[in-house]
Design a protein with these regions (language model features):
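Ribokinase/PfkB-type carbohydrate-kinase core domain
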Residues: 1-91, 160-165
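Conserved post-catalytic alpha-helical subdomain immediately downstream of the catalytic base
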Residues: 72-75, 79, 96-163
Length: 165
């Protein structure tokens, strides 16, 4: 955790933005993790991981509580999609397309990496969520955690994203 703290401090000092997907080591030390979150711009976790950070049962409630620690949060919930907040708006996003799931290995990582790729490429938060969902949807149609990863230039269609009040 000390190494992460140093890394985050250095990143902030050079103006870098931080998207963080904590692992079990960080999640098992809630107090230290909460201290690190002040440096994080976007936190992405799955529902079970989020429950190790804050209390709550409903996904929208969990995201609302996480927003007390970070400017933007994304909490994924398997084939139920995700709830995400950019600090201004909160969105519920489902699966990009209704597909036959061959394997779910790598789906969460594909969502996170898809979001990061699109967001760091200058796309809006909402557009990045669509790219993330498309990437994850593509990955679950293949066997293996890397098969199906989409190219940043892939043509995407719109998908419904519900704004939550």
């Amino acid at each position: 955790m000390n190494m992460l703290d140093q890394l985050f401090t250095k990143a902030r000092s050079i103006g870098a933005k931080i998207m963080f997907n904590p692992g079990n080591l960080e999640l098992d030390h809630q107090r230290k993790l909460l201290g690190l979150l002040s440096d994080v711009n976007v936190l992405i976790v799955n529902k079970n991981e989020a429950k190790k950070i804050v209390q709550g049962t409903m996904l929208s409630e969990i995201v609302a509580r996480i927003k007390n620690y970070v400017p933007a949060a994304i909490v994924t919930d398997g084939n139920q999609g995700a709830i995400a907040s950019d600090g201004q708006e909160t969105y519920r996003i489902g699966l990009y397309e209704d597909v036959i799931i061959k394997a779910s290995t790598g789906a969460g990582d594909a969502f996170g990496s898809g979001f990061l790729a699109a967001y760091s490429d200058g796309r809006s938060f909402k557009e990045s969520l669509i790219f993330a969902s498309a990437n994850s949807t593509s990955v679950v149609q293949k066997i293996g955690s890397k098969a199906g990863i989409i190219n940043k230039n892939v043509k995407l269609h719109n998908m419904p994203i519900q704004e939550i009040r």
